[in-house]
Design a protein with these regions (language model features):
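Conserved NTP-binding catalytic cores of kinases and kinase-like/nucleotidyltransferase enzymes
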Residues: 1-101, 214, 232-236, 381-419
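Active-site catalytic-loop/activation-segment of kinase and kinase-like phosphoryl-transfer enzymes
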Residues: 1-8, 155-208, 285, 385-406
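Conserved short submotifs of the Hanks-type protein kinase catalytic core
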Residues: 102-114
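Conserved kinase catalytic-core helix
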Residues: 113-156, 204, 210
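Catalytic-loop of the protein kinase fold
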Residues: 219-221, 226
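Active-site activation/catalytic loop segments of kinase-like enzymes and analogous catalytic loops
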Residues: 251-290, 305-327
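ATP/Mg2+ or Mg2+-diphosphate-binding catalytic cores
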Residues: 308-419
Length: 419
């Protein structure tokens, strides 16, 4: 890891080249970052050429994995795009400078606001409802404000990738992986011996296609983990754009309804808070997508997206990397090959099926609770999955069509299995 003065020196040089004068960054503070990223806050020495008093500097060291490293370009483009938006639609900080060769981003400092995770942990039931209502409004404003701007985002992405060999293909592959995870999750559940009703299977298949090509698309960071959402001055700001792009907006809604998959919820499913969240979101987007005002349509779309998140969460259980899974998964392998990513030929003599990797496999984690004991890690993972399936069951139970009853029973049975 580069030492702190070097990272900050690079950032100061970037700002100097862009804004003029001689920029100086002092009082450097290390912040929490995702993965191996280095994140710092620094105070800007007073300078007439640059009005910001402090900045956040993020460096994402190259890992050597081309799929992982492609996230930096996506994040840079997403910040470029977000910065170009009007303040009412802008989801988070503005981009102040960047250097793709040194993998450094400089963004505006939001200050010392609290994360959504902290807010939810401290909330009583009434406050919980109010927080989700505000979150629904913030998401809706972002979705409504960016629904017609997809071409602008794509232009920025094309500019960033066209001079970099195979970069565009890697970005397309990263998008495809999101829908592959839904399919892989279905396979993992079946491999664990759980029957999947036709209603669930059809919804999973449909939502797989809709994620990237649905008619209700808008810009989203996609990673809405509560640690990546900051509240300042009663407004929510979304951080971490490594998976940002144009996706079906109901996936964002479902992520919150599901109580943030891959994040242990502070509270049980709260029907009142969920309704307040969805209603606030609908009020912001109904002029853009009038169909969300029809309860049956809204119920169907959110339920399907919940199924998508549940299956994706199950897929993440697998200890194999996606490259390793691609060795034995023909559909995944085809997309890797199309993107120019090398995948080793499968070991036909002893290869395990995708998703099966020995005693610690995803299938094993999904075993019935009567077949315990479970390790501490298994218990945490099972709790997170249980929360997701409980949320799916609770939301599906409100649907009027008989198919929702089938979905409810499936989700409830899986939640019980994971106790």
């Amino acid at each position: 890891m580069a030492d702190t003065p070097e990272v900050i020196r690079v950032a100061a040089d970037i700002l100097t080249k862009r804004y003029g004068g001689k920029q100086e960054l002092v009082d450097v503070e290390r912040l929490d970052g995702s993965g191996v990223a280095e994140v710092y806050r620094a105070r800007v020495v007073n300078n007439p050429f640059f009005q910001h008093r402090s900045v956040v500097v993020k460096r994402s060291p190259a890992s050597g994995d081309e799929l992982v490293d492609a996230a930096f370009l996506r994040e840079t483009v997403a910040y470029q795009f977000a910065t170009s938006l009007s303040p009412s639609a802008r989801p988070g900080p503005v981009l102040l400078g960047y250097d793709t060769a040194q993998r450094v981003l400089i963004i505006s400092d939001l200050g010392d606001g609290r994360t959504l995770a902290d807010a939810l942990r401290a909330a009583d039931e009434a406050t919980h409802t109010d927080i989700l209502r505000k979150l629904g409004r913030a998401l809706g404003m972002m979705h409504a404000g960016t629904a017609d701007e997809e071409d602008a985002f794509n232009v920025l992405l094309q500019r960033m990738t066209r001079s970099r060999p195979n970069s565009a293909n890697l970005q397309k592959l990263r998008d495809c992986l999101l829908s592959h995870r839904i399919r892989i999750g279905v396979n993992v559940i079946e491999g664990a011996g759980v029957a999947i009703p036709a209603e669930v299977r059809i919804a999973a298949s449909n939502v797989q296609s809709r994620l990237l090509r649905g008619g209700m698309r808008a810009f989203t960071p996609f990673d809405l983990t509560p640690d990546n959402i900051v509240e300042t001055d009663s407004a929510f700001h979304f951080l971490d754009y490594e998976w940002a792009g144009y996706r079906d907006v109901t996936f964002d809604v479902a992520f919150v309804v599901a109580r943030f998959p891959a994040f242990l919820a502070a509270q049980p499913f709260n029907a009142q808070a969920t309704e307040a969240f969805v209603d606030a979101w609908v009020r912001e987007v109904r002029d853009v997508w009038p169909s969300v005002q029809h309860p049956d349509t809204l119920q169907a779309r959110i339920t399907a997206a919940l199924i998508g998140w549940a299956m994706s969460s199950v897929a993440l259980l697998d200890p194999l990397s996606l490259s390793e899974l691609a060795e034995h998964d023909e559909q995944l392998r085809a997309d890797f090959v199309a993107a120019g990513v090398d995948v080793p030929l499968p070991d036909l003599g002893g290869a395990l099926e995708a998703g099966v990797s020995g005693p610690d496999s995803a299938h094993d984690v999904l075993r019935p609770h009567s077949q315990g004991p479970f390790t501490a890690d298994e218990a945490l993972v099972r709790r997170d999955l249980r929360e997701t399936f409980e949320s799916l069951a609770a939301f599906a139970d409100a649907g009027a069509d008989p198919a929702y009853r089938t979905i409810y029973e499936f989700a409830q049975a899986l939640a019980e299995r994971l106790r």
